[in-house]
A protein has these predicted regions:
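C-terminal alpha-helical cap/extension of soluble enzyme domains
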Residues: 219-292
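Short catalytic-loop micro-motif centered on adjacent basic/acidic residues
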Residues: 20-24, 79-80, 102, 210-213, ...
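N-terminal amphipathic alpha-helix/helix-capping segment at the start of soluble metabolic enzymes
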Residues: 1-21
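Glycine-rich beta-strand-to-loop/alpha-helix junction loops that act as flexible
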Residues: 182, 213-216
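Alpha/beta enzyme core
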Residues: 6-12, 28-53, 59-76, 84-205, ...
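An acidic- and aromatic-residue-enriched active-site/binding cleft used to recognize and process polar
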Residues: 136, 215, 239
Length: 292
């Protein structure tokens, strides 16, 4: 099936009020497991690769693998660069064939975020590539363990300001906007408190498909309410990666207890199966199952 853009996926998700899962990948097992899950669920899907994961696998190495898998899939697939901040890397991803990129300028002042977003958007639009931007600070759990982030904060200082979001979309040409309303990257240590009223107002003022980052580990009700309030792309990685690791540990321990040998090809198969199972579960919650 031909590669699709984020804009195309968001158009259908907006019309039918569901969210498309964007799943970060770092190897072939994750790529194949996600595609298998999407095909089982008959769901559109976004294969996402984060700039921060380039030290694990070079962009030029993994891009052809992701793109080949996407084109061979029996469901619509967009290939997306996640949390791109380096303009050179963003441009390389587009040149390699990614159908969507995220420019993450959330750490910048509003005016500079707008300026740099427009720089990337101009190049992307010329190449037929969709663009996601970010406004507001999406935290890590308990400040994420990052030294520069503190545990106590005023939501108005870090969450997306609805009026700024309106200004941002009036001065940019993006296809989706990632917003901060209480989610955090990583696995949650305590139950997050999500500001759904803020999310609804952002949707009302911008009209854009909105993106949830830090989508791992929320309860089902939080996902559903977020989608009802305007979330159309839902990033999901940490919980999936954690589930795979737990599965591998359990399988290896079981084989060891039976004095059975384990081989790397066993681990590869177990990983793909664990990813597929988790992906199907999330797609049913996100409402994308059956939409392809």
């Amino acid at each position: 099936m031909p590669l699709v853009t984020l804009k195309e996926l968001m158009k259908d998700a907006e019309a039918k009020r569901y969210a498309v899962g964007a799943y970060n990948v770092i190897n072939l097992e994750m790529i194949r497991g996600i595609i298998a899950g999407a095909e089982e669920a008959r769901s559109p899907v976004i294969l996402s690769f984060a700039e921060v994961h380039i030290p694990l696998v070079p962009l030029e190495v993994i891009a052809p693998i992701i793109l080949a898998a996407a084109r061979q899939a029996q469901v619509p697939v967009a290939v997306h660069l996640d949390h791109g901040q380096d303009h050179e890397i963003l441009i390389r991803a587009m040149q390699l064939g990614f159908s969507s990129v995220m420019f993450d300028g959330a750490h910048l002042p509003l005016e500079e975020n707008i300026r740099q977003t427009n720089e990337i958007s101009k190049i992307a639009k010329a190449l037929g590539v969709s663009v996601e931007a970010e406004l507001g600070k999406i935290l890590r759990p308990e400040g994420g363990g990052a030294e520069e982030e503190i545990e106590e904060y005023d939501p108005d200082d870090v969450y997306t300001n609805p009026q700024e979001a309106q200004t941002f979309i009036e001065h940019t040409d993006v296809d989706a906007l990632a917003v901060a309303y209480g989610t955090a990257h990583g696995v949650y240590l305590t139950e997050p408190v999500l500001d759904f009223e803020r999310l609804k107002l952002i949707k009302e003022l911008t009209g854009l498909p909105l993106v949830m980052h830090g989508g791992s580990g929320l309860d089902e009700a939080a996902y559903i309410t977020s989608i009802q309030c305007g979330i159309r792309k839902l990033n999901y990685y940490s919980n999936m990666a954690h589930e795979v690791a737990n599965t591998l540990q359990a399988k290896l321990a079981a084989n060891s207890a039976k004095q059975h040998k384990s081989y790397y090809h066993d681990i590869s198969r177990w990983a793909m199966e664990a990813v597929q199972q988790d992906i199907v579960r999330t797609m049913r919650i996100f409402g994308s199952a059956g939409q392809a």
